């Protein structure tokens, strides 16, 4: 067991999907995994292990934001020796040609989070995805006939901000595709520990147009994203 995960050694696979919403973790396990077993419910953050196409895979909720995902990624790697980690989550689009329900592969993750500045003593480290996972995810999406978007996302520490329009316009000018709250931490920690990581994101709302999905959709749909992530992580 670790501080925030109640699993025993051997109960977590070395390949794991990381949704922020623990109810999405439950949905993924019950919908896509064979014989899923609950290994964690500490703080309501459900974690399951099962098999997908004959390969052992886990799924663990992480909560929202850099501090929360950092706790789970650190413990999954240090206490359970997880090798491959794929975040499956939602994001808000800031490019006009990115649509609600599009799937984005986050090649890099710009951020306003202080975490990396504290770690790197003011240096602006550029967290990026693992290339092998990125390529495999792109190929998996193409095989499904999907039009994937690949590029930079913005990991924000702030969901509500007074100068949001100004920040969004600046980020869009520099070709950032969407805004989310976790990928920078995932990529930085994966680099630190020599692990493979990727964020596969579904656009749940469009910050410019105002189009959005429902809370129920965000919990229990977006199956394209989940299948891409699962097919990628077992390669």
Swiss-Prot record:
This is Purine nucleoside phosphorylase DeoD-type. GO terms for cellular component: cytosol. It comes from Oceanobacillus iheyensis (strain DSM 14371 / CIP 107618 / JCM 11309 / KCTC 3954 / HTE831). It comes from the Bacteria. A purine D-ribonucleoside binds at residues 4, 180-182, 204-205. Phosphate binds at residues 20, 24, 43, 87-90. It holds the Pfam family PNP_UDP_1. One of its GO terms (biological process) is purine nucleoside catabolic process. Homohexamer; trimer of homodimers. It catalyses: a purine D-ribonucleoside + phosphate = a purine nucleobase + alpha-D-ribose 1-phosphate; a purine 2'-deoxy-D-ribonucleoside + phosphate = a purine nucleobase + 2-deoxy-alpha-D-ribose 1-phosphate. Belongs to the PNP/UDP phosphorylase family. The gene is deoD.
